[in-house]
């Protein structure tokens, strides 16, 4: 169905029969990753385990095709990008050989021509989970994400506690009851050159690192929207990275999803309009934190946003709504629109459908 809403006011929705954007994913899909290359969509990991699938969006009979399984084990929160015809997968959260949950800093490459994976002899200088990845001038850039040592230590402690609920409660209280700066989320910008498989320092945010931000780039500009400032506490901040000229500039734009912000939202561009949609967060957590409660989301219920915002004339306007709140899916550029694949809804339920958000003359169209 189609729902059209002006950028200035939410109008009555008009519904019409329409074909689905894409066929349903082979499995309910959330916390995975995806990329698009020459109109072919690739998705995998997350709730799909080690599975990967592709779909030719230009095919008359659109269907998902299974690819070679990912060799690095099941992972959540990995990122991926296409460079020169190859798919690169960065980090994620999964089990190590001892069965402990950990953050990875490795890189895998998939060759679509041979349907084969290889683990590269390359490791990022820090863990990659909750990070974002984008491509600029033939290189992959990574920023944001949790601190590998702190995160891994948390899960080591939980493993030691086992089924001792008292010990688990104590570990959680200790883990969440700290200020945002004490989690050392990554604020460095790293670049990965696929030709050399080397990582380099590319800059750092003058503010703070986030985890679970939405990312979108066009030309020399990249936007990082919302995300976690610490576990359980989101931010409404929007950062712009400007690669114009020889010097990278970091800018801070007007906030969105205020006051609490969201993580796991979706970002894209349609007809030069910057879009931000969905995401999940804890209403009231920002107020709790500002009043000195570091465990800001304790006792709060996670909520899922239906809001669609457009960046217009230097500010964000709520310009439409999703049919249901959604977060932690894959967002990709397709047909001059924002394509959302999968995600989770209330209660953490993984979904199989896709959503296409388009903008024309400041009007938002949502196709399910």
From Swiss-Prot:
Its EC number is 5.1.3.24. It catalyses: N-acetyl-alpha-neuraminate = N-acetyl-beta-neuraminate. It holds the Pfam family NANM. The keyword Isomerase applies. Its main location: periplasm. Keywords: Carbohydrate metabolism, Isomerase, Kelch repeat, Periplasm, Repeat, Signal. InterPro entries: Kelch-typ_b-propeller, NANM, NanM_proteobact. Transmembrane segments: none annotated. It is found in: Periplasm. It is an enzyme of class 5 (isomerase). Kelch repeats lie at residues 40-84, 86-137, 139-173, 174-219, 222-265, 287-336, 338-367. SUPFAM superfamilies: Kelch motif. Residues 1-19 form the signal peptide. GO terms for molecular function: racemase and epimerase activity, acting on carbohydrates and derivatives. GO terms for cellular component: periplasmic space. The active site is at 228 (proton acceptor). HAMAP family: NanM (MF_01195). Homodimer. Belongs to the NanM family. NCBIfam families: muta_rot_YjhT, PRK14131.1. Converts alpha-N-acetylneuranimic acid (Neu5Ac) to the beta-anomer, accelerating the equilibrium between the alpha- and beta-anomers. Probably facilitates sialidase-negative bacteria to compete successfully for limited amounts of extracellular Neu5Ac, which is likely taken up in the beta-anomer. In addition, the rapid removal of sialic acid from solution might be advantageous to the bacterium to damp down host responses. This is N-acetylneuraminate epimerase. It comes from Shigella boydii serotype 4 (strain Sb227). The gene is nanM.
């Amino acid at each position: 169905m189609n729902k059209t809403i002006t950028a200035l006011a939410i109008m009555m929705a008009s519904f019409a029969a329409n074909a689905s954007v894409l066929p349903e994913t082979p499995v309910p899909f959330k916390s995975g990753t995806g990329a698009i290359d020459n109109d072919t969509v690739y998705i995998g990991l997350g709730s799909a385990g080690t599975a990967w699938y592709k779909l030719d969006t230009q095919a008359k009979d659109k269907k998902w095709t299974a690819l070679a399984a990912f060799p690095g084990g099941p992972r959540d929160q990995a990122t991926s990008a296409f460079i020169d015809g190859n798919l690169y997968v960065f980090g994620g959260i999964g089990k190590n050989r001892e069965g402990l949950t950990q953050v990875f800093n490795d890189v895998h490459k998939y060759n679509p021509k041979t349907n084969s994976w290889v683990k590269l002899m390359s490791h990022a200088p820090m863990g990659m989970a909750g990070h974002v990845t984008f491509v600029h001038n033939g290189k992959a850039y990574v920023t944001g994400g949790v601190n590998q040592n702190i995160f891994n230590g948390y899960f080591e402690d939980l493993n030691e506690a086992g089924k001792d609920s008292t010990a688990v409660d104590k570990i959680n209280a200790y883990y969440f009851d700290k200020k945002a700066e004490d989690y050392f989320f990554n604020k460095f910008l790293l670049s990965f050159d696929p030709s050399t498989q080397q990582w380099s320092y590319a800059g750092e945010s003058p503010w703070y690192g986030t985890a679970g931000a939405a990312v979108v780039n066009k030309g020399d500009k990249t936007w990082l929207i919302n995300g976690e400032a610490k576990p359980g506490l989101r931010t409404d901040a929007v950062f712009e990275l400007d690669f114009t000229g020889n010097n990278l500039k970091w800018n801070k734009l007007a906030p969105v999803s205020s006051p609490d912000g969201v993580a796991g939202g979706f970002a894209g561009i349609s007809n030069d309009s910057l879009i931000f949609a969905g995401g999940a967060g804890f209403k009231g957590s920002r107020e709790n934190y500002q009043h000195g409660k570091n465990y800001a989301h304790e006792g709060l219920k996670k909520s899922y946003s239906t809001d669609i915002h457009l960046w217009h004339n230097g500010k964000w306007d709520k310009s439409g709504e999703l049919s249901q709140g959604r977060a932690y899916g894959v967002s990709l550029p397709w047909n001059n629109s924002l394509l959302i694949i999968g995600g989770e809804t209330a209660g953490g339920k993984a979904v199989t459908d896709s959503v296409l958000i388009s903008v024309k003359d400041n009007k938002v169209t949502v196709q399910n």
